[in-house]
């Protein structure tokens, strides 16, 4: 990810997503979740997006997609297994794009999609993939699909791309605290979200309108299933993931605090030694002696942040924690609303029962 690339500001402002793409993503992810493939492999469901870019309208139109090859577990100790997997993945991707072109389907790659529960799962590998795709085309995006919300009746597909500042740091592969601070990069502006408009065919729109107007169509509006609080497991899972991220952030804060103290101590020591050396050189020049070099002071090793990727992991953990908190907040607010509605309905039923009892007693008298 340290390859020097030219950073081009993207011009796309919104995304037009075909309903066929939504159906294929949902079917792909749900089939793998039902089979347990994601839990066994440990990888997220992923695929490639194809479509067209309309610069005059600042619109990215995603018209089709296809899944990518999964990384199969290596049974034997084969050193070339990873390379063979990448070659197989690239070959199958090219074959699929060639078939798209033959069938007169849009074959221009405009990004990729992945599934992450609760919309949180941004990792170092995902950032590398986003950088590679945006380096290939500045308009490329990633679609993050949340299967948990979809199973709860709310389709969740969000489009993201790296901001210009994040792309600059990713091209240098340098996430030191000084560079992150000078770029003004935080977890809130590291990624840019684009609005999505889902496009359906005209026949589908007509069918939905006819179903809504049809008297024989039962909407089940009096069903009590809308009051079910069926989010206990997902809420518990999101809270546990949030707690794990907070623990990692606490460790990172301790490392960053130690690094800040060591860096300040190092800068003060270098400044003090430089001042003394300059005064000593002035005295030597006054006596006619040659000045002493500053090389030994410059060779003093500066402290390093004890993390593998600088502040990148901290930024991603903060972003995931924020996504998990938003999910928990949405679920709890919906559950509280359902509880209030159920309580009001129960009280109304009790009052109605009492009124009917009083009226029957008065009539018998």
UniProtKB/Swiss-Prot annotation:
Superkingdom of this protein's organism: Eukaryota
Gene3D superfamilies xrefs: Cytidine Deaminase, domain 2 (3.40.140.10)
Region (Disordered): 276-295
Domain MPN: residue ranges: 15-166
CDD domains, per database record: MPN_eIF3h
Compartment(s) of residence: Cytoplasm
Positions with biased composition (Basic and acidic residues): 277-287
GO biological process: formation of cytoplasmic translation initiation complex; translational initiation
PROSITE patterns in UniProt: MPN
Keywords of the record: Cytoplasm, Initiation factor, Protein biosynthesis
A single MF term (Gene Ontology): metallopeptidase activity
Assigned GO CC terms: eukaryotic 43S preinitiation complex; eukaryotic 48S preinitiation complex; eukaryotic translation initiation factor 3 complex
InterPro entries documented for this protein: eIF3h, eIF3h_C, JAMM/MPN+_dom, JAMM_MPN+_peptidase_M67A, MPN
Family indicated by similarity: Belongs to the eIF-3 subunit H family.
Quaternary structure, from the entry: Component of the eukaryotic translation initiation factor 3 (eIF-3) complex.
Chain's role: Component of the eukaryotic translation initiation factor 3 (eIF-3) complex, which is involved in protein synthesis of a specialized repertoire of mRNAs and, together with other initiation factors, stimulates binding of mRNA and methionyl-tRNAi to the 40S ribosome. The eIF-3 complex specifically targets and initiates translation of a subset of mRNAs involved in cell proliferation.
Protein's UniProt name: Eukaryotic translation initiation factor 3 subunit H
Organism of derivation: Caenorhabditis briggsae
């Amino acid at each position: 990810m340290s390859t020097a690339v030219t950073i081009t500001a993207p011009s796309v402002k919104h995304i037009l997503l075909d309903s066929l793409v939504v159906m294929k993503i949902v079917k792909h992810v749900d089939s793998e979740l039902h089979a347990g493939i994601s839990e066994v492999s440990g990888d997220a469901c992923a695929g490639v997006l194809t479509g067209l870019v309309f610069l005059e309208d600042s619109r990215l139109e995603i018209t089709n997609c296809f899944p990518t090859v999964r990384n199969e577990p290596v049974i034997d100790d084969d050193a070339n297994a990873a390379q063979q997997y990448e070659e197989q993945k690239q070959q199958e991707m090219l074959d699929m794009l060639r078939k798209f072109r033959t069938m007169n389907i849009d074959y221009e790659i405009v990004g990729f999609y992945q599934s992450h529960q609760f919309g949180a799962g941004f990792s170092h590998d995902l950032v590398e993939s986003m950088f590679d795709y945006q380096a290939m085309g500045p308009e490329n995006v990633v679609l993050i699909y949340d299967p948990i919300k979809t199973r709860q009746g709310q389709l969740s597909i969000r489009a993201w791309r790296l901001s210009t500042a994040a792309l600059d740091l990713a091209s240098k592969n340098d996430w030191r605290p000084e560079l992150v601070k000078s770029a003004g990069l935080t977890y809130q502006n590291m990624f840019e979200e684009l609005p999505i408009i889902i496009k359906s065919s005209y026949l589908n729109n007509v069918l939905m309108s006819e179903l809504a107007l049809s008297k024989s169509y039962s909407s089940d509006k009096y069903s009590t299933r809308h009051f079910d609080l069926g989010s206990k497991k997902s809420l518990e899972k999101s809270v546990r993931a949030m707690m794990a991220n907070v623990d990692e952030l606490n460790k990172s804060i301790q490392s960053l605090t130690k690094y800040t103290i060591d860096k300040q101590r190092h800068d003060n020591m270098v400044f003090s030694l430089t001042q003394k050396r300059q005064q000593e050189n002035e005295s030597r020049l006054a006596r006619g002696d040659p000045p002493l070099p500053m090389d030994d002071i410059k060779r003093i090793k500066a402290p390093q942040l004890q993390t593998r990727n600088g502040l990148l992991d901290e930024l991603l953990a903060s972003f995931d924690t924020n996504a998990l908190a938003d999910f928990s907040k949405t679920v709890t607010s919906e559950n509280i609303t359902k509880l209030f509605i159920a309580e009001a309905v129960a009280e109304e039923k009790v009052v109605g029962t009492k009124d009917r009892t009083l009226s029957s007693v008065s009539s018998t008298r």
